[in-house]
C-alpha cells in the first residue's frame, strides 16, 4: 500500500448490525469513540449499523412488518368526529 495517502485514523473498525447479530471488521476512517471485543479476542473501535446487507429485506428476501398500529390509532383518534359530521350532511 502506498505510504502517506491514508488519513491518520485509517484503522480496523468493527461494523455491527444488532438486528442481524452480524459484524464485519473493515479498515475505515469512521469517527467513533465506542469499542467492542470481537470473536477473535481483539478489541476494535465499534460502529453500530441500523441496517446492512444481513438485515435489509432487499438482500435477505424476507419481509419485515412495520409497526403501524400506533400510527393508525392516532389517525383514528384524531379524526373520529369526522365520520359523524359527514353522515349529517
From Swiss-Prot:
<dbReference type="Pfam" id="PF01197">
    <property type="entry name" value="Ribosomal_L31"/>
</dbReference>
<dbReference type="GO" id="GO:1990904">
    <property type="term" value="C:ribonucleoprotein complex"/>
</dbReference>
<comment type="similarity">
    <text>Belongs to the bacterial ribosomal protein bL31 family. Type B subfamily.</text>
</comment>
<dbReference type="GO" id="GO:0003735">
    <property type="term" value="F:structural constituent of ribosome"/>
</dbReference>
<dbReference type="InterPro" id="IPR034704">
    <property type="entry name" value="Ribosomal_bL28/bL31-like_sf"/>
</dbReference>
<comment type="subunit">
    <text>Part of the 50S ribosomal subunit.</text>
</comment>
<dbReference type="InterPro" id="IPR002150">
    <property type="entry name" value="Ribosomal_bL31"/>
</dbReference>
<dbReference type="GO" id="GO:0006412">
    <property type="term" value="P:translation"/>
</dbReference>
<keyword id="KW-0689">Ribosomal protein</keyword>
<dbReference type="InterPro" id="IPR027493">
    <property type="entry name" value="Ribosomal_bL31_B"/>
</dbReference>
<protein>
    <recommendedName>
        <fullName>Large ribosomal subunit protein bL31B</fullName>
    </recommendedName>
</protein>
<dbReference type="InterPro" id="IPR042105">
    <property type="entry name" value="Ribosomal_bL31_sf"/>
</dbReference>
<keyword id="KW-0687">Ribonucleoprotein</keyword>
<dbReference type="GO" id="GO:0005840">
    <property type="term" value="C:ribosome"/>
</dbReference>
Amino acid at each position: 500500500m502506498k505510504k502517506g495517502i491514508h488519513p491518520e485514523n485509517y484503522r480496523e473498525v468493527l461494523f455491527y448490525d444488532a438486528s442481524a447479530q452480524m459484524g464485519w471488521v473493515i479498515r475505515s476512517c469512521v469517527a467513533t469513540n465506542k469499542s467492542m471485543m470481537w470473536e477473535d479476542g481483539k478489541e476494535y473501535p465499534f460502529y453500530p449499523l441500523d441496517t446492512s446487507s444481513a438485515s435489509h429485506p432487499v438482500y435477505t428476501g424476507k419481509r419485515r412488518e412495520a409497526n403501524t398500529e400506533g400510527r393508525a390509532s392516532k389517525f383514528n383518534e384524531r379524526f373520529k368526529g369526522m365520520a359523524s359530521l359527514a353522515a349529517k350532511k
